[in-house]
Amino acid sequence: MLFEQIAANKRKTVFIVIGFFIFVLMVGAAIGIIVWNNYLNGLILAAVIGAFYILIMVMTSSSVVMAMNRAKRITSKEQAPVLWDTVESMAMVASIPMPKVYIMNDLSLNAFSAGISPEKGAVAVTQGLLDNLERYELEGVIAHEVSHIRNYDIRLSTISIALVAVIAILSDLAMRMIFWGSVTGSRNNRKNDNNSGGGAQLIIYIVALVFVVLAPIIATAIQFALSRNREYLADASAIELTRNPDGLIQALQKVSGDTKKMKEVSASSESIYFSSPLKSKKDKPGIFDSHPPISSRIERLENM
């Protein structure tokens, strides 16, 4: 059951990622139709901006995320022996280099991981998590975060965030070009096409325009669907490492019952946390939720 769930989550992720890239290209094509009356120009624009933005995000993600979330690095075992030992042992079981260790001075119960590869991995936990979890519960949380690193989820999350940003940039660019009359020439060409093609070209233009306007919303929903799926995968992978579902289950129960809100958290980092630091812990999932409901995560773990 455990390995079947891991395999199913990986397959679902592949489909979502492929669909995400196709969606970005569709947005580019729609913009090409709107701005230049030529979908190929839009495809090229989307590919160039997308590649550049993803490269920048991947190169700077880890250090930026830690700074944005006020995480302070622990450089020796003596500073936090239990945390250090737990991260070290889980990394050893996962067969990855030991991630850098960080602590956030916050009383809420949460954690996150960063790093685009296992060699550049980092794990951060709140002081509240350290103070309130038993050792075996902490192992469950750390195993979850180490699984994110081992499964390259941070790289995937970084790319998905970059793609959402690219789509927002492309959509905004198209709207500005239309507003400032930069597409006058293409409008004239489109008008001539409408005269010869009956109104088909106008219909295509309107559909493309509506698609571009809605694209950022759809892209955000896709990004969060990917994030929710990777949370389920990290939970299952954590059990593979610890062989003790009770630790993670009880950690999730404590996190679910935690009423303290994080004092300082970056909204752009929401999806990488163990539990959403921004939204209430509800039982019903929403398409704009970065995490599945904790009750759903616990149910899946209990059924393994």
Curated annotation (Swiss-Prot):
Bilayer topology: Multi-pass membrane protein
Co-factor binding comment: Binds 1 zinc ion per subunit.
Presence of keyword tRNA processing: no
Region Disordered: start-end pairs: 276-295
EC identifiers of the protein: 3.4.24.-
Active site: 145
Coiled coil: none
UniProt keywords, alphabetically: Cell membrane, Hydrolase, Membrane, Metal-binding, Metalloprotease, Protease, Transmembrane, Transmembrane helix, Zinc
Residues binding Zn(2+): 144, 148, 231
Cofactor(s) named in the record: Zn(2+)
GO MF assignments: metalloendopeptidase activity; zinc ion binding
Compartment(s) where it occurs, according to its Swiss-Prot or TrEMBL record: Cell membrane
One Pfam family hit: Peptidase_M48
Chief location of this protein within or outside the cell: membrane
GO cellular component: plasma membrane
UniProt protein name: Protease HtpX homolog
Organism per entry: Listeria welshimeri serovar 6b (strain ATCC 35897 / DSM 20650 / CCUG 15529 / CIP 8149 / NCTC 11857 / SLCC 5334 / V8)
Classification lineage: Bacteria, Bacillati, Bacillota, Bacilli, Bacillales
Gene: htpX
